[in-house]
């Protein structure tokens, strides 16, 4: 919970800042260097201040800053605030856009809505061949903390379209679909094909769309061809819409 402080009859809302922690032992959380610097040097919190801690796996605690250190700050966890056992049932394989700002926008919004895995893929018509994973991970982490979500999405390494089908465990997904603009391929609406509770994997192609061979390959691998509406969508918009529709059908938004 956050706090209200009353000063001379005036009530002031004081939100608790959220920090992500991988290293939690019993009731002690040790923040890494990046989160420690943010706590002490950016937010200028002090020992005794109350914060929120998330582990990215569905848990959120209230804690007290116990030992300040710019490389490893110690937080004593006082009580559990929230606990969720089911991660978002949405994963998206998507081609990074030529303009990286648009891809970063997708990552931010999909994280806010709720997403489990993001697989950047390279197709024949891809215009961007490399991404900065470290920078993109920071965008995802910030969006996770800002949105209040308890699950930190996993951004996987960039992978070719061919290797994607060979290396990803597609059997772990109970619903697989792809969006494309090829009108002579049979397509159904996502709303009519997806059923609540299915673990979904959605494929989004590049600005120039998937090739016919890529579409055929995906269909052979069990992907359904779907449409997301009547409009022709940008890559990042298609990813966000697919994510939103799947979460909506699972009553998450």
What are these regions (language model features)?
Residues 95, 129, 207, 231, ...:
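Glycine- and other small-residue-rich loops at beta-strand/loop junctions that grip anionic moieties
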Residues 22-23, 33-34, 56, 96, ...:
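Fold-independent oxyanion-binding glycine-rich loops
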Residues 212-253:
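Structured adenosyl-cofactor binding patch, chiefly the S-adenosyl-L-methionine
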Residues 1-83, 134:
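N-terminal positively charged helical leader segments and presequences
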Residues 84-177:
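RNA substrate-binding interface of SAM-dependent RNA methyltransferases
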Residues 176-217, 223-230:
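Active-site/ligand-binding-proximal alpha/beta "capping" segment
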Residues 51, 75, 152-157, 225:
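Generic structural signal for residues in well-ordered beta-strands
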